[in-house]
């Protein structure tokens, strides 16, 4: 007995089912898929079938909630701003546009300045939010804080105002509509 004489047991290996090869094969014409319908078309597979086993999407619990009006806030520490100033990446005034480019943020982001780190530069920083410690450190160094009210995307959509001005003007309050009372 040698390796070349080894064969699988009789009946252990089944031949491949060749479908769609004429009526004599028993699986011609419709190739065992029945007549018409989505299941007979090519490319059809049932999504997430696990063959009678409880599928994953039903085994796992539902959880969480995504608020529709969630604000995306990018946080920047004063130590980071100080580093940018020392490297010469920003000047005397740091705008929301500067923060966007230096943080690789999107146009929908709000920016919050946090007070971590040392800060000795007298600069004007424009951002949407400031922590109390950040305001104290900036003013102690001789700088100013300017609050922006809109994201870059919102400011670009304001008609009749220059971009920089649109950033800094507060949004108009949303007025609630009064319900009309039915007179009958």
From Swiss-Prot:
Positions of the UniProt region annotated as Disordered: 1-62
GO process annotations (BP): translation
InterPro entries cross-referenced by the UniProt entry: Ribosomal_uL15, Ribosomal_uL15/eL18, Ribosomal_uL15/eL18_sf, Ribosomal_uL15_bac-type
Record-linked Pfam families: Ribosomal_L27A
Residue spans of biased composition, Gly residues class: 21-35
GO molecular function, one term: structural constituent of ribosome
Keywords from the UniProt entry: Ribonucleoprotein, Ribosomal protein, RNA-binding, rRNA-binding
Any one cellular-component term (Gene Ontology): cytosolic large ribosomal subunit
Family indicated by similarity: Belongs to the universal ribosomal protein uL15 family.
PANTHER family xref list: 50S RIBOSOMAL PROTEIN L15 (PTHR12934), LARGE RIBOSOMAL SUBUNIT PROTEIN UL15M (PTHR12934:SF11)
Quaternary structure, from the entry: Part of the 50S ribosomal subunit.
Stated role: Binds to the 23S rRNA.
Name of the protein this chain belongs to: Large ribosomal subunit protein uL15
Annotated organism of origin: Chlorobaculum parvum (strain DSM 263 / NCIMB 8327)
């Amino acid at each position: 007995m040698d390796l070349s004489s080894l064969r699988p047991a009789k009946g252990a290996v089944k031949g491949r089912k060749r479908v769609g090869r004429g009526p004599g094969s028993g699986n011609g014409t419709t190739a065992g898929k029945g007549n018409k319908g989505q299941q007979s078309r090519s490319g059809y597979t049932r999504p997430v079938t696990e063959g009678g086993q409880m599928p994953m999407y039903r085994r796992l619990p539902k959880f969480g909630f995504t608020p529709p009006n969630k604000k995306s806030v990018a946080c920047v520490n004063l130590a980071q701003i100080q580093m940018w100033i020392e490297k010469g990446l920003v000047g005397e005034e740091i705008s929301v546009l500067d923060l966007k480019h230096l943080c690789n943020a999107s146009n929908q982001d709000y920016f919050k300045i946090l007070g971590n780190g040392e800060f000795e530069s007298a600069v004007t920083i424009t951002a949407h939010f400031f922590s109390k410690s950040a305001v104290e450190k900036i003013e102690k160094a001789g700088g100013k804080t300017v609050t922006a009210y809109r994201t870059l995307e919102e400011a670009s959509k304001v008609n009749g105002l220059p971009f920089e001005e649109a950033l800094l003007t507060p949004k108009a309050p949303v007025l609630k509509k009064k319900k009309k009372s039915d007179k009958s």
